[in-house]
C-alpha cells in the first residue's frame, strides 16, 4: 500500500480555502447584521411615534401636533422602505432559483 508523502500535500492551499469560506460567511453575516440593525431602527422609530402620540393625548406640553405628524411620516416611510427592500430580496431570490444550472 502506497501512502502519499505529507510534503507533497499543499497545506497552504487548504488553509487559504478555509480562510475564503470564513470571509464569505463574514460577508453574509455582515448583510444579516445590517438588515437586523435596519429593522431595529424601524422598530425604534415606530415606538417613538407611539410614545409621542400617547404623550400628546395626555396633554404634555413638550409635544406638538407638528412633531406627531413628522414622526408618523417617518415611520410610514421607513415601513415602506422595509417593504420595498423585502420585495427586492424576494424577487432576487426567485430569479436565482429560476436559473438553470
UniProtKB/Swiss-Prot annotation:
Keywords for this protein: Bacterial flagellum
Residues in coiled coil: none
The name this protein goes by in its record: Flagellar hook-basal body complex protein FliE
GO molecular function: cytoskeletal motor activity; structural molecule activity
Family membership noted in the UniProt record: Belongs to the FliE family.
Alphabetical list of SUPFAM superfamilies matching this protein: Phase 1 flagellin
Domain of life: Bacteria
PANTHER family xref list: FLAGELLAR HOOK-BASAL BODY COMPLEX PROTEIN FLIE, PTHR34653
Gene Ontology CC terms: bacterial-type flagellum basal body
NCBIfam families, A to Z: fliE
Pfam families: FliE
GO biological process: bacterial-type flagellum-dependent cell motility
Localization per record: Bacterial flagellum basal body
Amino acid at each position: 500500500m502506497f501512502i502519499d508523502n505529507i510534503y507533497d500535500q499543499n497545506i497552504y492551499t487548504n488553509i487559504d480555502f478555509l480562510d475564503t469560506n470564513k470571509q464569505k460567511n463574514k460577508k453574509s453575516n455582515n448583510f444579516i447584521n445590517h438588515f437586523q440593525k435596519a429593522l431595529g431602527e424601524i422598530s425604534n422609530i415606530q415606538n417613538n411615534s407611539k410614545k409621542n402620540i400617547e404623550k400628546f393625548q395626555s396633554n404634555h406640553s413638550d409635544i406638538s401636533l407638528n412633531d406627531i405628524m413628522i414622526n408618523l411620516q417617518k415611520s410610514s416611510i421607513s415601513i415602506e422602505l422595509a417593504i420595498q427592500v423585502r420585495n427586492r430580496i424576494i424577487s432576487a431570490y426567485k430569479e436565482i432559483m429560476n436559473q438553470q444550472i
